[in-house]
Amino acid sequence: MIRRHIWWILLIACLALGLLWPRLGHRDQVIPVPCQDIVAGCALSPAGLRVRFDRQPDALQRFKVYVELPNVPEVHASFNMRGMEMGFNRYRLLTDGAGRWQGEVMLPACIQGRKDWLMMVEADGVRYEIPFNSR
């Protein structure tokens, strides 16, 4: 009887570990990218990253994001603010096959009226954090 209880405990422990493993595993590396003018473009030379917008973004208005990042299979972009999650807004950017990625995106509305945004560009297990301001 005790042996049976031990097997159940081990089974439950294995299931719990399986469910928690993704949260315990490796965290994506976050690299800050300094950016003065997101429309002119911002770059991080060692990674080969360059990011720019087609215009100064405004909440709930579509704009284009352009990312240059060679040798990665996928690029995703999302938008948040420091200390404030802005809901699910993750975009998969499309490539031209030469390390250039683009997508049409939209900033969520901030009910506090803040304009200080963080764009997260995710590629190949690395997250690049790019600060910018909206109108």
Spell out what each predicted region is.
Residues 97-106:
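Aromatic sugar-binding surface patches on proteins
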Residues 4-23:
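Hydrophobic membrane-insertion alpha-helices, especially the h-region
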Residues 46-96:
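Extracytoplasmic/periplasmic/luminal assembly and interaction segments
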Residues 72, 98, 112-116:
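Extracellular Ig-like/FN3 beta-sandwich strand-entry sites
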Residues 19-61:
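Transition segment at domain starts
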